[in-house]
Amino acid sequence: MRFSFLSGIRDLFRHFIISAASGALSDRLGWVWGAIAKVFSGSVWLRYKIAKPPHQVQATVVSVGNIVVGGTGKTPLVLWLAQALNERGISCAVLSRGYKGKCSQRKSFTIVDPALHTAACVGDEPLLLAKHLPAGTVRIQKDRKALAEKSAGAFDVLLLDDGFQCNRLHKDVEIVLVNGSDPFGGRAFFPKGRLRDFPERLAKANYVIVNGKCSPSDQRELDLLNPAAKILVEPQISEIVWLNKSANMPRDHWEGLGVGVFCGLGFPKGFLTMLRNAGIHVLGTHLLPDHSGITKQELELFCKKIILRQGVGILCTEKDSVKIEAFAEEMSLPIGEVRMRFSCVCNEERMVAMLDAIEAIQKNKKVTT
């Protein structure tokens, strides 16, 4: 009960600060953000100091996380990992808190079913993952330790979504993503910067995946923190699916496409850069706080604005599209869901080695249990 209550208060406070820090008050209250950042960093330090030994479960636990508030590409990586391990005959469950989903408040876990659940119920990211993964494999509950205990007997591998700060559960493999353009979250704790953890903790990761181009100085610093585990990837568009046309857009039509873009991401700059790198002309944006949804009225107003700028459609991420399915077909412009994939810039063999290592740990754990 105490765990659930404190988590609820923390999430409510975090959502308020994110909304305020991204709005007009941000510049005026810099000193307030600095003071709160000191309190936040102190609470993070204390949490690690008083942490009890982590609980071990029967299955292999692979954590995918980050050290900043949102926006590093965890969800596409979790999806890729689950699919890659499934191809090797390894059964996987994705364990998520179901952030901002009403079902996450329940004492028992919820198996995410796209045919039954909405993003408001289970959270946008779990719903997105459940659409692409085998039925019954995406599960949400705030208490991931309890969720892991209930799921361990049914799966070979448990993928812990956003698990780097989860101290209550033993993790066999730690994968941490960082944004190449800002790997250290502005070098300040949230809300003054975007850090939610100490950069020094990257040394504890088995693999650090750098999403996007990184400056030479940041690369050197990452190498000092964790020299052996770095993997460089670039986000790329795999396809664009028009929700209200039920059709894919051919790749050769992307160049010069004039569109509006809306998204609720922790780091929208990365998404916009990827679109521009593909030759897409962004005529206007409607940016929302991470995990926030756009209303039907807001989206239609944005469509009309883009029509005046001679735009031919509106693009959003998969995470955003799951929140507008009920009214996407009613909009005055086509709505395009941008699907992404990671492309290895270098060290591709490390991605394969990472999968090999997870498989080896899983097989060894299976023999010893």
From Swiss-Prot:
Keyword Hydrolase (UniProt):
no
Known EC number: 2.7.1.130
Q: Which GO terms describe its cellular component?
A: plasma membrane
Q: In which pathway does it act?
A: Glycolipid biosynthesis; lipid IV(A) biosynthesis; lipid IV(A) from (3R)-3-hydroxytetradecanoyl-[acyl-carrier-protein] and UDP-N-acetyl-alpha-D-glucosamine: step 6/6
Give the catalytic activity.
a lipid A disaccharide + ATP = a lipid IVA + ADP + H(+)
Q: Which Pfam families match?
A: LpxK (PF02606)
Q: Which GO terms describe its molecular function?
A: ATP binding; tetraacyldisaccharide 4'-kinase activity
One GO BP on record is: lipid A biosynthetic process
Keywords, sorted A to Z: ATP-binding, Kinase, Lipid A biosynthesis, Lipid biosynthesis, Lipid metabolism, Nucleotide-binding, Transferase
Which residues does the record give as ATP binding sites? V68, V69, G70, G71, T72, G73, K74, T75
Q: Where are the transmembrane segments?
A: none
**Family from the record:** Belongs to the LpxK family.
Q: What does this protein do, in the record's words?
A: Transfers the gamma-phosphate of ATP to the 4'-position of a tetraacyldisaccharide 1-phosphate intermediate (termed DS-1-P) to form tetraacyldisaccharide 1,4'-bis-phosphate (lipid IVA).
The UniProt entry, under NCBIfam families, shows: lpxK
What protein is this chain from?
Answer: Tetraacyldisaccharide 4'-kinase
Per the UniProt entry, what species is this protein from, by scientific name? Answer: Chlamydia muridarum (strain MoPn / Nigg)
